[in-house]
């Protein structure tokens, strides 16, 4: 689950980390009042969406008058912002953050994330602050510093010494950096985060560390113990199909292809996508109905996939271990009848009650085809999508 910038900064402040003063608004009428309340003569108007690259896309603008604050806010609110990291349709701007402008004497990148290959939490830092870290990793990878946290020890000052040295910080900043990194680490652990990114992290004219932007992602599997964070969820920023899939307990990720995929088990779902790619097709989604799939869940999976207008065929790949193939076949048939399915569905069944399941599909008058094996299924699905 992702948070908006203003929500992430609220968590930072609660952890004792200073952030720029700002006020969130939901309509442009509030814009001037917010700027007046902040004071000063320059403000930053920031669209709140769950995507990086807002600045390049025009989602972060500086205003020098109260009228400018109002006009920029009015133009943003209610519109959609498309960035390099968002979908083609962009994301709706329902809220705008008005912040005081802060001047920097130095700019950095600092983040905490999970390093799965190393099986540890890792600090990532760079002197190339304010730019997308993915771009830095591609063009200048030696500019990125990694400092892994030993899970048996937790945060230790040597980590900040290593990061401070790599960032060529003056020794006077070492203690503030240690305090900052320690608080970030505790925030990361206490809230089961998967990403905590400060970009840019600046040193102000008052010689203080200050995050101008903050991004936080929370482990969905840990949300059951963080109801206060669940309440911050903004479903308008999420693909409605993914939200619906979560409610149905389906693991779903939309893609750009034309062949819908349904499988039971994440590994089998990935193998199904791989075999489609291998034979020249393009999967339209990842969809795992789970090892204990029921006919009802399969029916809901069909409905979910068909919300995409790009789908030209569907490949169902089921291994009947715990689940019976005849129950899956029944779910497919019921879904096809209820939805009035017009596109070809290729079904590969293997395992428990497979013969009965295939028999049910063969006897069904609808546009359902049983496949002998996964290769046969992939080739039929690709041919049907042509």
Swiss-Prot record:
Mg(2+) binds at residues 199, 213. Its cofactor is Mg(2+). Residues 9-244 form the ATP-grasp domain. Pathway: Carbohydrate metabolism; tricarboxylic acid cycle; succinate from succinyl-CoA (ligase route): step 1/1. One of its GO terms (cellular component) is cytosol. One of its GO terms (biological process) is tricarboxylic acid cycle. InterPro entries: ATP-grasp (IPR011761), ATP-grasp_succ-CoA_synth-type (IPR013650), ATP_grasp_subdomain_1 (IPR013815), Succ-CoA_synthase_bsu_CS (IPR017866), SUCC_ACL_C (IPR005811), Succ_CoA_ligase-like_bsu (IPR005809), Succinyl-CoA_synth-like (IPR016102). ATP binds at residues 46, 53-55, 100, 103. Keywords: ATP-binding, Ligase, Magnesium, Metal-binding, Nucleotide-binding, Tricarboxylic acid cycle. Substrate binds at residues 264, 321-323. The keyword ATP-binding applies. Its EC number is 6.2.1.5. HAMAP family: Succ_CoA_beta. Heterotetramer of two alpha and two beta subunits. Succinyl-CoA synthetase functions in the citric acid cycle (TCA), coupling the hydrolysis of succinyl-CoA to the synthesis of either ATP or GTP and thus represents the only step of substrate-level phosphorylation in the TCA. The beta subunit provides nucleotide specificity of the enzyme and binds the substrate succinate, while the binding sites for coenzyme A and phosphate are found in the alpha subunit. This is Succinate--CoA ligase [ADP-forming] subunit beta. It comes from Dichelobacter nodosus (strain VCS1703A).
């Amino acid at each position: 689950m992702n948070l908006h910038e203003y929500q992430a900064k609220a968590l930072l402040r609660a952890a004792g980390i200073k952030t720029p003063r700002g006020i969130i608004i939901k309509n442009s009428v509030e814009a001037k009042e917010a700027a007046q309340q902040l004071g000063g003569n320059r403000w930053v108007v920031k669209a709140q969406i769950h995507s990086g690259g807002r600045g390049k896309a025009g989602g972060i603008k500086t205003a020098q008058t109260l009228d400018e604050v109002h006009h920029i806010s009015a133009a943003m609110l209610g519109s959609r912002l498309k960035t390099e990291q968002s979908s083609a349709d962009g994301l709706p701007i329902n809220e705008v953050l008005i912040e005081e402008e802060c001047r920097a004497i130095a700019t950095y990148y600092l983040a905490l994330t999970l390093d799965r290959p190393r099986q540890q939490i890792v600090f990532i830092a760079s002197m190339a602050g304010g730019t997308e870290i993915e771009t830095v990793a591609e063009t200048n990878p030696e500019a990125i510093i990694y400092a892994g946290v030993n899970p048996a020890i937790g945060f230790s000052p040597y980590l900040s010494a290593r990061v401070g040295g790599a960032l060529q910080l003056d020794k006077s900043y070492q203690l503030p950096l240690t305090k900052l990194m320690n608080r970030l680490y505790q925030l990361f652990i206490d809230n089961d985060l998967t990403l905590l990114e400060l970009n840019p992290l600046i040193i102000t004219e008052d010689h203080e560390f200050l995050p101008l932007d903050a991004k936080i992602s929370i482990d969905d599997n840990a949300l059951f113990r963080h109801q206060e964070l669940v309440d911050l969820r903004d479903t308008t920023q999420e693909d409605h199909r993914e939200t619906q899939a979560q409610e149905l307990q389906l693991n779903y990720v939309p893609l750009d292809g034309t062949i819908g995929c349904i499988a039971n088990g994440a590994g089998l779902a990935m193998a199904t996508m791989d075999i489609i790619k291998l034979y020249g097709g393009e999967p339209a989604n990842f969809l795992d109905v789970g090892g204990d799939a029921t006919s009802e869940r399969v029916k809901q999976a069909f409905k979910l996939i068909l919300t995409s207008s790009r789908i030209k065929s569907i490949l169902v790949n089921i291994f009947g271990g715990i689940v019976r193939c005849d129950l899956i076949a029944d779910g497919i048939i019921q879904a096809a009848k209820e939805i009035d399915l017009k596109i070809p569905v290729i079904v590969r069944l293997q395992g428990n009650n497979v013969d009965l399941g295939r028999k049910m599909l063969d006897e069904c008058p609808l546009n359902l085809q049983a496949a002998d094996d996964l290769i046969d299924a992939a080739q039929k699905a690709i041919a049907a999508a042509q």
